[in-house]
Regions:
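Hydrophobic/basic alpha-helical segments
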Residues: 1-186
């Protein structure tokens, strides 16, 4: 563990980088059993700087927790989406269908799609929270009440359900990795 930290410190110095301990965070990723065995480590020292451990870190817009359950990421994504859905709900009566659909894609759908391939192994209950976001969005775009079944709305809007979007994204990534249009490291 310490040799890896020394190598990291050496790499920083080779690339003229300085570690800012005030902005740096560390976490231990693994199973809950493995994390319990490493619970006695409270901080790490890298090049004389002490970095404390946190339960969740944000990396490229994805919130990672220690056990890689993505619960916090799904909760934050849902919260952000519902904030924008609320804004769309307030203006929905003033815009036509095509504009509402465009706003829905611009403000909410991309949040559901961003890095969703990492959720492929998540339990259905976790994906269901994101599906509720999409169902609410479809109801607002189509001006329907909240008690109507949402599957016909998704079909009418030509939107895949969230679990299908995840599978489609994985299939797309796989196809691009196998085709000639992908970078050599994939």
């Amino acid at each position: 563990f310490e040799t890896a930290l020394l190598k990291l410190s050496f790499w920083f110095s080779l690339n003229y980088l300085a570690l800012n301990p005030d902005k740096s965070e560390a976490t231990l990723l693994g199973t809950s059993h493995r994390n319990l065995t490493l619970a006695d480590i409270s901080a790490v020292n890298v090049a004389g700087s002490t970095i404390g451990f946190v339960d969740n870190i944000k990396l490229l817009g994805v919130t990672l927790d220690k056990s890689l359950t993505f619960r916090k990421h799904i909760a934050l994504t849902s919260q952000s989406c519902f904030y924008h859905i609320k804004a769309l709900r307030h203006i929905r009566h003033t815009v036509d269908f095509s504009t509402a659909s465009l706003i829905a894609h611009a403000l909410v759908s991309f949040r559901l799609d961003y890095a969703n391939s990492i959720l492929s192994g998540s339990p259905k209950t976790a994906i269901l929270k994101l599906q509720r976001v999409q169902n609410t969005l479809a109801r607002i775009v189509l001006r329907s009440n909240r008690f109507t079944h949402s599957a016909p709305f998704l079909e009418r809007l030509h939107w895949l359900p969230v679990h299908s979007r995840i599978r489609f994204k994985l299939a797309t990534i796989t196809y691009r990795a196998l085709s000639t249009s992908s970078p050599h490291y994939l």
